Curated annotation (Swiss-Prot):
It comes from Mus musculus (Mouse). The chain crosses the membrane at residues 25-45, 65-85, 97-117, 236-256. The gene is Tspan33. Homodimer; disulfide-linked. Interacts (via extracellular domain) with ADAM10 (via extracellular domain). Interacts (via cytoplasmic domain) with PLEKHA7 (via WW domains); the interaction is dependent on PDZD11 being bound to PLEKHA7 and facilitates the docking of ADAM10 to zonula adherens. Glycans are attached at N172. Residues 1-24, 86-96, 257-283 are cytoplasmic. This is Tetraspanin-33. It is found in: Cell membrane; Cell junction, Adherens junction; Cytoplasm.
Amino acid sequence: MARRPGVPAAYGDEFSFVSPLVKYLLFFFNMLFWVISMVMVAVGVYARLMKHAEAALACLAVDPAILLIVVGVLMFLLTFCGCIGSLRENICLLQTFSLCLTIVFLLQLAAGILGFVFSDKARGKVSEIINNAIVHYRDDLDLQNLIDFGQKKFSCCGGISYRDWSQNMYFNCSEDNPSRERCSVPYSCCLPTPNQAVINTMCGQGMQALDYLEASKVIYTNGCIDKLVNWIHSNLFLLGGVALGLAIPQLVGILLSQVLVNQIKDQIKLQLYNQQHRADPWY
């Protein structure tokens, strides 16, 4: 059948505006994070199942396992839209993926700006989280390990000072506290001992009963909030690099999905054009 003059041969039935490079690059991009999300969920669920029931209900707000599961599930759903949308060339799924990714990016950007502008309120929120974590220190093994790591990493003890540990029922200094750890602090507050082969987990025994000078000979007495703030100020470039590293994959995903959506729309227009002119004897 003769082709209408002026219609490019490249726009025949075999031509496609959809670039295989863009399509499969977006697919494998989402597949990678899809697998990562499933690993995150699996690790989070495993961590929850390994805990006792009472510990599992003790401190949901700061439980790292719960956080891992929630982030993993959200990432799974988001990357599912990206994977299937790119593979099936589904505009609805691709637009959903792009919109959700844009919202996540804007929320992260807003959180960073608000944290910088309202640094005092952010500091207060961090203090609240740390104090809540201190209260539930013995209730959650993951939380306990996280606090111990933070205190050793930043050479600190408690939120404001080492006496913050009195908020914990096991370390409380009240006379009616029957705990053997009464008026103590965790071993992670203790100053490191050179060439120590075995960790002395009782090194913080009775430290809250000592004054600042006496306690400073054995444990860290400064709180972790000030140490954390100082660390952030000293590593702004590093944190900026991490933020950029998180933002780049999101921006790439948004860009690729929008490019693919536009290509699919152009392909649909081409198919409609071919259908409308198929009955034309000069087509």
